[in-house]
Amino acid sequence: MQKFMRLFFLGLFFILFMTTQIKADGCLTYDSLCSTMYDKCCTSMKCKGFFFGYCKSI
């Protein structure tokens, strides 16, 4: 149960961190943490990594 709670709060923190990295136009800047399933990187960038990664130039 404690492991689940830790995972839950880690996920919550990650979501909050993600939203602070998003610029006004709604895209993630270079080297921002991103999810490969929900790629919101700015133009000419792609989320590189396995499941989670960083926005890098294409």
Curated annotation (Swiss-Prot):
Using the record, list the residue span of the signal peptide; answer none if the entry has no such feature: 1-24
Question: Which comment does the entry carry about domains?
Answer: The presence of a 'disulfide through disulfide knot' structurally defines this protein as a knottin.
Q: Name one GO cellular component term.
A: extracellular region
Output this protein's name.
Answer: Teratocyte protein CftICK-III
What's in the keyword line of the UniProt record? Disulfide bond, Secreted, Signal
| The UniProt record lists the keyword DNA repair | no
Give its localization.
Answer: Secreted
Q: What does this protein do?
A: This endoparasitoid wasp peptide has immununosuppressive and insecticidal activities. Suppress cellular immunity which is detectable as a reduction of hemocyte encapsulation in the host. In vivo, ingestion of this peptide (probably at excessive doses) increases larval mortality and reduces leaf consumption in both lepidopteran species D.saccharalis and S.frugiperda, which are permissive and non-permissive hosts for C.flavipes, respectively.
| Disulfide-linked positions | 27-42, 34-47, 41-55
Q: In which tissues is it expressed?
A: Abundantly expressed by teratocytes, which are extra-embryonic cells released by parasitoid wasps into their hosts during larval eclosion.
Q: What is its main location?
A: secreted
A further note on this protein reads: Negative results: does not influence host total hemocyte count. Does not influence hemocyte spread index in the host. Has no effect on humoral immune system, since it does not influence the activities of prophenoloxidase and phenoloxidase in the hemolymph of larval Diatraea saccharalis.
Asked if the keyword Disulfide bond belongs to this entry, the reply reads yes
Q: Which domain of life is it from?
A: Eukaryota
